[in-house]
């Protein structure tokens, strides 16, 4: 079931309204950061990955399809993939 908050966020994202990012950050950043930190095990990389996650969310906002995934699932996948990419990049540079 889609919540009113999710409907509001999706509506703002589809319109290109930057308030959507603020609302997402307020409501989901802690959970996304937790996911990212579990993958990266490094606070600096995790913070960088979280920031990049929000950039990707904004750039891909109009591609989000609520019939394919709930909003949090979509955000989670972006965060997870960004964390994995950041970790690979870090390991390639310093590993």
State where each predicted segment sits.
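Structural recognition of an alpha-helix C-terminal capping motif at a helix-to-coil junction
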Residues: 34, 48-55, 69-81
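Sigma70-family region 2
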Residues: 14-15, 54-68, 91
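N-terminal module of bacterial RNA polymerase sigma factors
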Residues: 1-31
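Short, charged helix-capping/linker segments at alpha-helix termini
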Residues: 14-22, 33-52
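Arg/Lys-rich amphipathic alpha helix in sigma70-family domain 2
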Residues: 63, 77-95
């Amino acid at each position: 079931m889609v919540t009113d908050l999710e409907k509001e966020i999706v509506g703002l994202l589809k319109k290109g309204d930057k308030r959507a990012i603020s609302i997402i950050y307020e409501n989901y950043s802690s959970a996304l950061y937790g996911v990212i930190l579990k993958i990266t095990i490094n606070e600096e990389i995790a913070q960088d990955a979280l920031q990049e996650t929000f950039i990707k969310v904004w750039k891909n906002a109009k591609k989000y399809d609520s019939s394919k995934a709930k909003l949090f699932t979509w955000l989670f996948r972006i965060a997870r993939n960004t964390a994995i990419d950041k970790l690979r990049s870090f390991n390639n540079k310093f590993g």
